[in-house]
């Protein structure tokens, strides 16, 4: 069987909806004992800190009958100069899959090229595909559909914005992205998402007006303004994003039954107020829980052979 990598949301273009449905089914049967991935071993290489991704992946494969091995880059020969390629060739002999969280997307691609086992992008500077499965699973649970929705992302045009646009396009969801000038998503992702959206009768709209994005929204989503590794830009970005905070005034433009989403961790008082994050419209903790169930769906899809 040829290996399958998930480095981008595009690697799930043909079966994203199917993976989401599988994840929902696994959640419904969360207390059932599974041995689908018995004796399967998932390696975790994380260059960046993680709460949700690492924990949920470890629990996910355990609940499917396999187990995980955490590999700290600073404790590996990778941290002493061994190449990513050599590391990939060696780990392929021990593991059944690798989840890699990296600062540089090129390193994720290089690892995938050098392994004979699936490589999963567990977040890098370009995309966060695992988060997208959990996000749209949450939307399916809360709204019952992907189409005829206005999904608005308000914030930095970062890796999350890139992946969310691709996910929305694949699933036929109309999406607005509101970012300050100079902080919009990468044009290559906008163009690719619009091309896919056109095939599904949906649209991707880029704006610099957060009120336009929030108006009549069914879903409002945000992320941190300062991503990991961008600490030196804190002052600049806080100034640029001050009108893009998700607060009570902004969400008053949305539909009454809108849901608020955030991939977490949240910097409360910056990109979102406590009033919104803790409101009855907020689904951020359901969304976080769905990291577990959606990753079970992804791992089952990749490794149950």
Swiss-Prot record:
Pfam families: OTCace, OTCace_N. Pathway: Amino-acid degradation; L-arginine degradation via ADI pathway; carbamoyl phosphate from L-arginine: step 2/2. Keywords: Arginine metabolism, Cytoplasm, Transferase. L-ornithine binds at residues 159, 223, 227-228. Its EC number is 2.1.3.3. It comes from the Archaea. One of its GO terms (cellular component) is cytoplasm. GO terms for biological process: arginine biosynthetic process via ornithine; arginine catabolic process to ornithine; citrulline biosynthetic process. InterPro entries: Asp/Orn_carbamoyltranf_P-bd, Asp/Orn_carbamoylTrfase, Asp/Orn_carbamoylTrfase_sf, Asp_carbamoyltransf_Asp/Orn-bd, Orn/put_carbamltrans, OTCase_ArgI. PANTHER family: ORNITHINE CARBAMOYLTRANSFERASE, MITOCHONDRIAL, ORNITHINE TRANSCARBAMYLASE, MITOCHONDRIAL. This is Ornithine carbamoyltransferase, catabolic. The lineage of its organism: Archaea, Methanobacteriati, Thermoplasmatota, Thermoplasmata, Thermoplasmatales.
């Amino acid at each position: 069987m040829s290996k399958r990598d998930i480095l981008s949301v595009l690697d799930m273009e043909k079966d994203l909806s199917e993976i989401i449905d599988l994840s929902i089914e696994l959640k419904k049967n969360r207390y059932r004992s599974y041995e689908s991935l018995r004796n399967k071993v998932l390696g975790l290489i994380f260059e960046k800190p993680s709460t949700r991704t690492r924990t949920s992946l470890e629990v996910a494969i355990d609940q499917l009958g396999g187990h995980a091995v955490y590999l700290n880059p600073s404790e590996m020969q990778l941290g002493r100069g061994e190449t990513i390629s050599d590391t990939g060739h060696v780990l392929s002999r021990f593991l059944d899959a690798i989840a890699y969280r990296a600062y540089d997307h090129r390193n994720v691609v290089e690892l995938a090229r050098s392994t004979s086992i699936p490589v999963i992008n567990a977040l890098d500077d370009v995309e966060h595909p695992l988060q997208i499965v959990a996000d749209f699973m949450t939307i399916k649970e809360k709204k019952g559909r992907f189409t005829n929705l206005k999904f608005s992302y308000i914030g930095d045009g970062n890796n999350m914005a890139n992946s969310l646009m691709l996910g929305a396009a694949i699933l036929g969801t109309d999406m607005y992205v509101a970012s300050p000038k100079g902080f919009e998503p990468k044009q290559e992702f906008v163009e690719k998402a619009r091309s896919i959206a056109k095939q599904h009768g949906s649209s991707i709209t880029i704006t610099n007006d957060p009120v336009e994005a929030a108006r009549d929204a069914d879903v409002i989503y945000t992320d941190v303004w300062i991503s990991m590794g961008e600490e030196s830009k804190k002052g600049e970005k806080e100034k640029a994003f001050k009108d893009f905070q998700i607060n009570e005034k902004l969400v008053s433009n949305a539909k009454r039954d809108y849901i608020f989403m955030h991939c977490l961790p949240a910097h409360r008082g910056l990109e979102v107020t406590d009033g919104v994050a803790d409101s009855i419209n907020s689904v951020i903790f359901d969304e976080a829980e769905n990291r577990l169930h959606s990753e079970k769906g992804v791992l089952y899809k990749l490794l149950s052979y």
